Regions:
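Residues at alpha-helix caps and immediate loop-helix transition turns in enzyme cores, especially N-
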Residues: 79, 109-110
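Conserved G1/Walker A P-loop phosphate-binding module
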Residues: 1-91
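Conserved Walker B
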Residues: 68-69, 75, 102-103, 134-135
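C-terminal-of-GTPase-core extension/linker across diverse P-loop GTPases
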Residues: 1-36, 105, 109, 116-217
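Generic enzyme active-site microenvironment
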Residues: 65, 99, 131
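Short acidic (Asp/Glu) and glycine-rich catalytic loops that position anionic groups and cofactors
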Residues: 66, 92-96, 166-171
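The start of beta-strands in P-loop NTPase/AAA+ ATPase cores
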Residues: 62, 93-96, 128-129
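Inter-motif core of Ras-like GTPase G domains
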Residues: 79-104, 116-123
Length: 217
């Protein structure tokens, strides 16, 4: 689609951040929060079929944020064309935010599906932050003290999961609730630091980092 290609080309010297993830993990809700827009957020498959791009400013730093269609295990053939522009957006992104529904019982399998899709797109080496969403909906069943059976994933607390993933990902993951707006400011700080770092690398002579921006611009 030539028009979309031209639009992408004309976005200037701004770092591009793409929200990626399995379908129905809360990407559009997070997009609404970060971009203060009303992206169609609905609890069903493929609520976002087109790619939505917004200019976002955190502190003095503008960048482009795109909300992409959710990945699934087996993409229906008739939907492949609809995914073309969203996949181009992922390929052209400088930073990926991999949004995960941590309250879903199969969230680890969903992570693997997304990682495989990114690998198929040749995007495995892109800078990435895992955003574990829906912490407000996470539930687990504590084991009784005298229960000697092996612990299952149903017995793992949110704190234990956080410790495991933060040890694995170091500073490249964060736990939030977009719906409850929990930990969003820390996510913004993390995004600001990564985007600023990428911007200095990619556009070392662009001085807008030292200007003051407002949300209205």
């Amino acid at each position: 689609d030539k028009q979309k290609a031209t639009q992408r080309k004309n976005r200037g010297r701004l770092i591009r951040v793409a929200l990626v993830g399995y379908t129905n993990v809360g990407k559009s809700t997070l997009m609404n929060l970060l971009a203060k827009s009303e992206v169609f957020a609905e609890n069903k498959l493929f609520a976002t079929l087109d790619t939505t791009v917004r200019k976002v400013i955190i502190e003095n730093l503008p960048f482009l944020l795109s909300d992409t269609v959710g990945f699934i295990r087996k993409l229906p053939t008739d939907l492949v064309d609809s995914f073309k522009s969203t996949l181009d957006e992922v390929r052209e992104a400088d930073l990926l935010l991999h949004v995960v529904d941590i309250s879903h019982p199969d969230f680890e399998d969903q992570i693997k599906v997304v990682e495989k899709t990114l690998a198929d797109l040749g995007c495995s080496d892109k800078p990435l932050i895992i955003v574990f969403n829906k912490t407000d909906a996470y539930t687990f069943t504590p084991k009784e003290e005298d229960d000697l059976t092996p612990k299952t994933k149903e017995n793992v607390s949110l704190d234990e999961l956080m410790q495991t993933w933060m040890a694995k990902m170091h500073d490249a993951c964060i736990f939030i609730s977009a719906r409850e707006r929990d930990n969003i400011e820390n996510l913004k700080t993390m995004m600001y630091n990564r985007v600023r770092e990428l911007h200095v690398q990619k556009y070392p002579y662009n001085d807008f980092l030292y200007q003051t921006y407002t949300d209205e611009e």
